[in-house]
């Protein structure tokens, strides 16, 4: 059992723990004959161009020296501005993992990942050196919250009062395969949370961000971050208590060491 996120100063709450077998597949490696998933690298917008392109035969193994987006983040030198290929190669896995944990399904996670990189590439020239991964967290999370609000608004405006709900279709084989690998118990517990609470818990207990970083990502005060995490964790406990078959599987709530 691995404690995700690690201890934090002044954080006496419990943290979400995930069983070691609940690893998410990486975004780019998800492209297989079984799933037939198109990777983001094939979706590079043709309308976007960048003078610095990276070919496959130019790729070298990482070294101890700063390279890629790390150089740009550290120096702010426009000459080291990353290309689309560099952004995707270095950050797609992490962005996809966050998008999946937030959205709870493969289709939305892929859409959020694609939209995140489009947004990043369009804005990278105006990026101020700081924490590049934190910037990615903020964009991904805000896009997710925007998606949730947009869908809620569409449902409220478009559905008539006498709308008959249609039962959901049975999960297709691709979704069954995907869920079996990704710990459906964990995702079901997270999906039970309101979007704002889910984002705070995912960023804290899965992505390992500090309360201050979460506040910057979500654009809320520190007290609001603490409240959302506390209430989100309590909601997880309530969910697990109501679904004991999940309590001994992939999701546990243990004290911070």
Swiss-Prot record:
Keywords: DNA-binding, Sigma factor, Transcription, Transcription regulation
One Pfam family this sequence matches: Sigma70_r4_2
Start and end residues of each stretch annotated as Sigma-70 factor domain-2: 87-153
Complexes and interactors: Interacts transiently with the RNA polymerase catalytic core formed by RpoA, RpoB, RpoC and RpoZ (2 alpha, 1 beta, 1 beta' and 1 omega subunit) to form the RNA polymerase holoenzyme that can initiate transcription. Interacts (via sigma-70 factor domain 4) with cognate anti-sigma-E factor RseA under reducing conditions, which stops the sigma factor from functioning. Inhibition is specific; RsaH and RsaL (anti-sigma-H and -L factors) do not inhibit SigE.
Classification via CDD domains: Sigma70_r4
GO biological process: biological process involved in interaction with host; DNA-templated transcription initiation; regulation of DNA-templated transcription; response to heat; response to xenobiotic stimulus
Family membership noted in the UniProt record: Belongs to the sigma-70 factor family. ECF subfamily.
Disruption phenotype: Increased susceptibility to detergent and heat shock, slighty decreased resistance to oxidative stress. Poor growth in both human and mouse macrophage-derived cell lines. Attenuated infection in both SCID and BALB/c mice. 13-fold decreased transcription of sigB, no change in its own transcript in culture. The sigE mutant induced the up-regulation of human and mouse macrophage gene expression, which correlated with an increased innate immune response.
GO molecular function: DNA binding; sigma factor activity
Protein name in UniProt: ECF RNA polymerase sigma factor SigE
Keyword Zinc: no
Function: Sigma factors are initiation factors that promote the attachment of RNA polymerase to specific initiation sites and are then released. Extracytoplasmic function (ECF) sigma factors are held in an inactive form by an anti-sigma factor until released. Responds to heat shock and surface stress (detergent exposure). When combined with isolated core RNA polymerase from M.smegmatis is able to guide initiation from the sigB promoter. Required for full expression of sigB, and for sigB induction after detergent exposure but not after heat shock.
């Amino acid at each position: 059992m691995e404690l995700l996120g690690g201890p934090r100063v002044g954080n006496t709450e419990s943290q979400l723990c995930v069983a070691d077998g609940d690893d998410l597949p990486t975004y780019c490696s998800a492209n297989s004959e079984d799933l037939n998933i198109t990777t983001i690298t094939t979706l590079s917008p043709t309308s976007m161009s960048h003078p610095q392109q990276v070919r496959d035969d130019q790729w070298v193994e990482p070294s101890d020296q700063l390279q890629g987006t790390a150089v740009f983040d550290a120096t702010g030198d426009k000459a080291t501005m990353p290309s689309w290929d560099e952004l995707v190669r270095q950050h797609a896995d992490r962005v996809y993992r966050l998008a999946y944990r937030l959205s709870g399904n493969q289709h939305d996670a892929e859409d959020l990942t694609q939209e995140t990189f489009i947004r990043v590439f369009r804005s990278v020239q105006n990026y101020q050196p700081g924490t590049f991964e934190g910037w990615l967290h903020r964009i991904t999370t805000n896009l997710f919250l925007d998606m949730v609000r947009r869908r809620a608004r569409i449902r409220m405006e478009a559905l008539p009062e006498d709308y008959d709900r249609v039962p959901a279709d049975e999960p297709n084989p691709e979704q069954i395969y995907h869920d079996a690998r990704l710990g459906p118990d964990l995702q079901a517990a997270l999906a039970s949370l309101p979007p704002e609470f889910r984002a705070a818990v995912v960023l804290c207990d899965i992505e390992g961000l500090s309360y201050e970083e979460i506040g910057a990502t979500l654009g809320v005060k520190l007290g609001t971050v603490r409240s959302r995490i506390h209430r989100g964790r309590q909601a997880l406990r309530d969910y697990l208590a109501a679904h004991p078959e999940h309590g001994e599987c992939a999701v546990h709530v243990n004290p911070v060491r």
